[in-house]
């Protein structure tokens, strides 16, 4: 009889303990649970169900900070000259705006250089909303559409920063030229020193890159039309396996089709592939793009169901896609979803802008490479607090396969690598505009 009160107490303690364990092990409330179709070939939980430990968010000093008043007098006018594909030009624009504020200059609308390689002829105003950009940059930096009459007839003094080696300092190297010529143009250097940026210059860069750049109304209309045509929910996949991409990587792929091998050889020029131990070292460093077949294996290792709707955010000329679409059958592309006449008329920048819009708004984003588009998309998704973003690890894939792992053992090892990456947000390489928060 003495033991009768103890039993209810024991049951209560046991029940409470189990409830506490369930709460602690439940997925973080910050994680967006995407109702992707069931049917994973490797398990019941996909990568998006992994509980995150760290999270990137826009830094408070930028979003909530007080603007430093602009000086009464400008040191001159700066035009940022942007080259390459759309996302490379956008990267240069972001850097250039921060530099212009650093040098207390007035910003002239950037010049998007015609690039024959990208089949492109559109300028900044053809892709981005100029008035929106000027409005959002108000208080951060003065932006003008037209130069004063005494300067408008002159060509800017061109300052070549892009290929400078070593740490490049704009205050020491460019400010004297701006004061001398009053109107200069430049392409930002990759090796610039940001440690000398005051907070107001960094805030200007962040504002320009993540708050002020908006597609033109006509282009946004096309992007919304494309987005609406994709079955929901969906994953946006940035897959890079074009002939020029493979040729540039200098990697060897022995099991490709004859047509793919011929296309790669035609694009190689003097970029011969590495051989022997150098080839293995290069691959283990993560320098070789994933093939579509390797991408399939990677997605399956992450328990991404083969019935998932996938939007292929990619350029023209992808090779070896049969191996991918035979497994993941719900694949959608711009060329299929858009009006064929409109699609045929589109230039490279327009297509890249559409991929960008879809990718920053998709339920999930996966990249097989880590190029300019991936960096911009990852940052914008973070800005929008959309955290289902992942970069497939080429380095881990090469290292694990070199150890002889295959089948279920390889998939399990790849899962562990990417589970860790997703949990702590590793690999995003986000710029100074974002800060890490412990969850």
Curated annotation (Swiss-Prot):
The keyword Transcription regulation does not apply. Substrate binds at residues 238-240. Glycans are attached at residues 104, 119, 293. GO terms for molecular function: glycosyltransferase activity. InterPro entries: FucosylTrfase_pln, GDP-Fuc_O-FucTrfase. Its EC number is 2.4.1.-. The chain crosses the membrane at residues 8-28. One of its GO terms (cellular component) is membrane. This is O-fucosyltransferase 13. It comes from Arabidopsis thaliana. The gene is OFUT13.
């Amino acid at each position: 009889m003495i033991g009768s009160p103890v039993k209810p107490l024991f049951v209560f303690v046991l029940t409470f303990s189990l409830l506490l364990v369930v709460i602690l092990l439940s997925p973080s409330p910050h994680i967006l649970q995407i109702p992707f179709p069931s049917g994973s070939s490797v398990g019941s939980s996909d990568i998006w169900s992994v509980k995150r430990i760290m999270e990137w968010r826009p830094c408070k000093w930028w979003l909530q900070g007080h603007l430093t008043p602009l000086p009464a007098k400008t040191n001159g006018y700066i035009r940022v000259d942007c080259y390459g594909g759309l996302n490379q030009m956008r990267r240069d624009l972001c850097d250039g705006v921060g530099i212009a504020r650093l040098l207390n200059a007035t910003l002239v609308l950037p010049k998007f250089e015609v690039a024959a390689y990208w089949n492109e002829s559109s300028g900044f105003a053809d892709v981005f909303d100029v008035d929106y950009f000027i409005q959002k940059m108000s208080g951060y930096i003065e932006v003008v559409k037209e130069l004063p009459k005494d300067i408008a007839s002159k060509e800017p003094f061109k300052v070549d920063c892009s290929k400078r080696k070593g740490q490049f300092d704009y205050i020491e190297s460019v400010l004297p030229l701006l004061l001398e010529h009053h109107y200069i143009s430049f392409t930002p250097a990759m090796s610039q020193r940001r440690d000398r940026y005051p907070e107001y210059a960094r805030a200007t860069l962040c504002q320009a890159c993540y708050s002020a750049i908006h597609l033109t109304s006509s282009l946004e209309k096309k992007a919304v039309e494309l987005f609406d045509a994709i079955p929901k929910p969906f994953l946006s996949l940035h897959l890079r396996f074009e002939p020029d991409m493979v040729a540039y990587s200098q990697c060897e792929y022995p099991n490709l089709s004859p047509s793919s091998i011929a296309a790669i050889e035609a694009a190689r020029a003097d970029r011969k592939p590495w051989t022997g131990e150098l080839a293995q070292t290069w691959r283990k460093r993560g320098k070789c793009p994933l093939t579509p077949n390797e991408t399939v294996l990677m997605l399956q290792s992450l328990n991404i169901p083969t019935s998932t709707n996938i939007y292929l955010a990619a350029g023209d000329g992808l090779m070896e896609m049969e191996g991918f679409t035979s497994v993941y059958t719900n694949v959608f592309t711009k060329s299929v979803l858009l009006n064929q006449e409109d699609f045929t008329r589109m230039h490279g920048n327009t297509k890249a802008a559409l991929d960008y819009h879809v990718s920053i708004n998709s339920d999930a984003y996966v990249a097989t490479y880590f190029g300019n588009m991936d960096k911009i998309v990852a940052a914008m998704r973070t800005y929008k607090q959309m955290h289902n973003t992942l970069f497939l690890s080429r380095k881990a894939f090469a290292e694990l396969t070199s150890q002889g792992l295959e089948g279920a053992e390889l998939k399990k090892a790849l899962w562990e690598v990417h589970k860790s990456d997703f949990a702590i947000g590793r690999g995003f390489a986000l710029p100074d505009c974002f800060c890490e928060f412990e969850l």
